[in-house]
A protein has these predicted regions:
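Conserved beta-strand positions in the central sheet of alpha/beta enzyme cores
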Residues: 47, 77-79, 136-139, 175, ...
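Short, acidic/polar
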Residues: 58-70, 117-129, 182-190, 250-253
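Active-site groove signature of glycoside hydrolases
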Residues: 130-148
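Conserved, mostly hydrophobic/aromatic
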Residues: 36, 48, 78, 93, ...
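N-terminal binding-site loop/beta-alpha segment at the start of enzyme catalytic domains
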Residues: 2-105, 161, 167
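Acidic (Asp/Glu)-rich catalytic clusters
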Residues: 37-40, 94-102, 127-132, 191-196, ...
């Protein structure tokens, strides 16, 4: 079998692998749900990572099958971004969410524009690619430099675009992401308080080695909890670097992130590591 093509059994194996971690499937065989912070929305504890969906190793049909099979088995949280794979990730997800699947999904995307004008342009482009008139969650992407929070809240900055998008009904909820330094996240939250600006979600890397260096779990998660934010976890496997040590399995990495007060752990269900774990754990037939 061509390793770059996924059939129905393999897709289900991947879903099963991430869902069985810690008993994350309910009695009906669907992935369990968690509450997304103060929004009160119920979302799947595992999310489909949009970055993987647009990669060349997958065809458009592969991407559609993965997304729809995931939704059919309770993974309703869809992650994406304006800049993933030059827009291909959003285009593929938009096609996959036709035929009634958009109504079953909790759809999130992100934008990179630092100014109001550039952000507005990217938001509208994302809506067109995703073939929808609104998002469930829209996030400011890659808060990774210490001046990013200042730029976000500056006059004419992206904060104005995010607020306008919510007021116009282009998104139900708003948040921000970053993966570089927990102190940048904390500074963003500090400026949000000073500006009386209310985020609904916060996204950050949470993985097994996090506690040893620039720990988001120790520094940011408690603050996010105090503010009632929905906590989104990414990079649970350290972009694959952690797995190269062969000291932990993919499912163990996922279980660590799920053990934290996260609402959603975003992962690439099409990855070789996940499918390998499914076969190893005997979950392929479930």
């Amino acid at each position: 079998m061509n390793e770059e093509r996924w059939n129905r059994r393999e897709i289900l194996a991947g879903i099963a692998a991430v869902a069985v971690a810690g008993g994350r499937m309910n009695a009906e065989g669907a992935v369990q749900q968690r509450v997304l912070g103060r929004t009160g929305e119920k979302v799947s504890c595992l999310g489909v990572g949009g970055s993987h969906i647009g990669k060349p190793k997958l065809s458009d049909d592969d991407a559609t099958r993965i997304i729809r099979q995931a939704i059919d088995h309770g993974l309703n949280f869809m992650d994406n971004s304006w800049d993933y794979n030059d827009g291909k990730s959003e285009i593929r997800m938009g096609k996959a969410l036709r035929d009634g699947y958009r109504q079953k999904a909790f759809l999130m995307t992100k934008f990179d524009g630092r100014t109001k004008d550039s952000a507005n342009q990217q938001i509208d482009e994302s809506l067109r690619r995703l073939q929808t008139d609104h998002l469930d969650l829209l996030q400011f992407h890659e808060t990774i430099r210490f001046d990013d929070p200042d730029r976000f809240f500056a006059p004419g900055g992206a904060a104005e675009a995010l607020t306008a998008a919510k007021q116009a009904g282009k998104t139900r909820f708003i948040g921000f992401t970053g993966h570089k330094d927990p102190h940048i996240h904390l500074y963003m939250l500090e400026l949000a308080r000073k500006n009386n600006y209310q985020f609904d979600t916060i996204q950050m890397p949470l993985y097994v080695m996090d506690a040893h260096f620039r720990s988001f779990a120790k520094l940011v998660v408690p603050e996010a909890q105090k503010m009632g934010l929905g906590i989104l976890s990414m990079k649970s496997m350290g972009s694959g670097v952690i797995l190269k040590s062969k000291t932990v399995a993919p499912v163990e990495c996922l279980e660590y992130a799920l053990s934290l007060p996260t609402s959603v752990v975003i992962t690439g269900i099409d990855s070789q590591q996940v499918f390998g774990a499914a076969k190893q754990d005997g979950a392929g037939g479930q």
